[in-house]
């Protein structure tokens, strides 16, 4: 989207939005939106103009394009973007619950051709408290590498060892997570399971 020439970034955004409109009914997914439109003073105003282009489209668009955006740091988003009328709702997705972690393990074990019957999913869920889905997936991948290096097969003990060796972001970034959870109180709909 971003281009080094003046005005090209805004044109790229307009073209992408026009393409979405021609494809409607559709969902337009903007992943980590704060990285593309966080407003700062170090880009010559490009981010501000890109934001303006998006806001204008959101206000004027009549096509059936459902806009969904994710953000890891919602506080970096400008208020004019997240106000009611621009976004219908703000959802907060917290860390996965124990039941959801079991499903995540099942998905990633089966994806790699492993029988989940060989694993105690509730125990794995307990050992992965505070883990994100990506961290659970990485523990499975790391366990497979460790098993392969030892000419063995991934088993419960090896996977639990990988989990024990992992420091999840909920620990590394505990203060940031606490601030995010606090910010979301009364401002966002909790979408957790």
Q: Which residues fall in each region the model found?
A:
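Walker A/P-loop NTP-binding motif of AAA+ ATPase domains
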Residues: 1-125, 131
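C-terminal engagement/docking regions of AAA+ P-loop ATPases
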Residues: 122-140, 149-193
């Amino acid at each position: 989207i971003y281009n080094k020439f003046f005005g090209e970034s805004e044109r790229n955004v307009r073209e992408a939005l026009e393409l979405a409109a021609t494809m409607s009914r559709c969902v337009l997914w903007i992943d980590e939106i704060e990285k593309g439109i966080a407003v700062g003073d170090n880009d010559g105003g490009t981010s501000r103009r890109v934001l303006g282009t998006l806001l204008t489209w959101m206000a004027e668009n009549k096509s059936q394009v459902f806009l969904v955006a994710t953000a890891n740091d919602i506080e970096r988003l400008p208020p004019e973007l997240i106000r009611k009328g621009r976004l219908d709702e703000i959802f907060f997705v917290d860390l996965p619950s124990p039941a959801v972690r079991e499903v995540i393990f099942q998905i990633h074990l089966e994806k790699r051709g492993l029988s989940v019957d060989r694993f105690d999913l509730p125990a794995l869920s307990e050992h992965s408290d505070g883990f994100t889905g990506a961290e659970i997936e990485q523990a499975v991948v790391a366990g497979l590498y460790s098993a392969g290096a030892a000419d063995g097969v991934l088993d419960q003990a090896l996977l639990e060892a990988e989990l024990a060796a992992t420091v999840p972001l909920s620990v590394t970034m505990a203060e940031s997570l606490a601030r995010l959870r606090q910010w979301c109180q009364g401002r966002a709909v909790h979408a957790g399971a």
